[in-house]
Amino acid sequence: SKVSPNEIHNHIVDDLIASKNGVIVLGEHLNSNPNSIAITNLISQIALVSDFKIANLTLSGNALSAEKANFIPGENGKDAISMFNDNSKAFLLMGVDCEYDFLDSKLASDCFDIEDVFVISLSSYEGQSVFKNADVILPMASFYETSGTHINFDGLVQSFSASIKSPGESKPGWKIIKVMADLLDLEGFDYVDSTQVKDEALQSSK
C-alpha cells in the first residue's frame, strides 16, 4: 500500500542526505517481523543510494555465526512458525525453552503436545516446560561447561574454552549431535573436538 510521508519522515530523509558517514542500525525486533525480508530489502536500497553502512544488532551473541555458517533457513527451509503450521512430526530442540524462546510460546507448546509429534530436547536445565514438551531429554553442557566459538558484531572470531567440567552425564551439544549422527549412520560427522566443527563451519562461510 502507498505510504504518505509526514514531517518526521522528511526530517529523517534530510538527516540522511546531510550525513557523510551514516550508519543505519537494525534491531533484533526486525528479525521477528513478518515483513522482515521486505523491510531489509528496502533498507538495503536506502543504504545503497545514500552510501551508508548497515549495522544489524542481534539478540543472540552468536546470531552472526549462524548466518555465516548458513545455519539459518535457506530458500527451501522453514522457520519455527512455518514448522508449527506445516504439521511437522519431529523436532530437535537445542538449548530451547518453549516458554521463553519462541515469539508464540503457546503455538509452540500446543504443537509439541500433539500426540504424534516427537520432541527431543538437548537441555542444560530442568525447566518445567522442557519436561512438559519433550519426549526425550538429553543433558547438554551449559555455555560455561563447553568450548566453542562466536563471531561477534564486528565479524571477529572468538573461541573460548570450558570454564568448569560439566556435571553427571551431560555432554557438549556438538558431541551429542555427533553421536546421534553416528547412530543414524550419517556421513560428515567425524569430529573429535569442537575446533574441527569450528574450522569446517568457518570454511563453509567463505
Annotate each PLM feature.
Residues S1-K206:
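Non-catalytic alpha/beta scaffold blocks inside enzyme catalytic domains
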